[in-house]
């Protein structure tokens, strides 16, 4: 059996590139998306390449960016606009494969192994996607072409902007092993520091290291990273819209900025709970288990779940349980980058159970009616036609339409 053909497409400076399309008067001028430009607070979510040449970086405070790049223009984020472009990009990808796995709004893996007889080899498909993104959407992408997901991602990071890089079996050692080990997916700052203690500075150093030593100091992650560095990654690209029996309903997102307090997490959990609850109702299910997943900015992740008192598909109940689980299990040792909510142990809507006499049946019925009304309003007028008051506390965090954008992140190695 031949090698797989995996692409990783990354929209260059996604938010900033899209804003440039809508602000032609800023052509050739530095631009950054983030925070509240009028209030002069917040952080940079993304900067264009002109601003980056001045040293402007993602996560930098707006006032700092202004200091090092006085001519920079700040624009407020418009997540609905960026999501629309993301959908259009996925429509292009879908013409080459139904195996596409998003990694945030701007990145996506594509398994085009079965497309070569009709569309050409991986390099040819990458070139065609790159051309179409420019001509049809007006934006550029960097694409990695490889035999697995890890090196395809490394390939898209290898050269930017508007570039295509191959990482074939015959060449990955030559191209990848000299790169800093921090360039490898899932090597965060903390892991990078630990590896440095063993003299591991490059991907090649990691590949040549003793796997048992890595396992003893890094646990399961040591062996995983050693495998990645040596090209051993057989994780599949998920099949889009695969029709499998529904065992759980969940959603996760990498947030536009790091979450640093309970209030930040509460906003995102409610957005995700709205998505999960709405999908449960659409499919005629209720859940008896609520689960959350959390990944910090060092890419350490954990999941926790709770068996709840009664089956539910009520948004407020799922959100409240999710927030309770979070409060009981997270100590804020690090900021948070990614959050997920899942409803499991599903039963059908007509499932009967005895309700606790002390619970407010009337209150639950009112909540169910309210959820149904919200569902109908959003069906008719769009997701943003009605939002919870909580969402207005942070315009950036509340901008993602989690119901419509099921952003899935690779987590099979961290189960």
Q: For the regions a protein language model found, what residue spans apply to each?
A:
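DNA-contacting surface of Y-family translesion DNA polymerases
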Residues: 8, 183, 191-336
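Short, charged/polar surface micro-motifs in flexible loops or helix N-caps
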Residues: 14, 37-40, 297-300, 346-349
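Short Gly/Ser/Thr- and Asp/Glu-enriched loop/turn motifs at secondary-structure junctions
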Residues: 103-107, 146-149, 285-289, 334-338
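Gly/Gly-Pro- and Ser/Thr-rich, intrinsically disordered tail segments characteristic of DNA damage-repair
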Residues: 1-227, 237-240, 278, 364-415
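C-terminal hydrophobic structural anchor segments
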Residues: 323-380
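Short, hydrophobic beta-strand segments
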Residues: 108-114, 303-306, 353-359
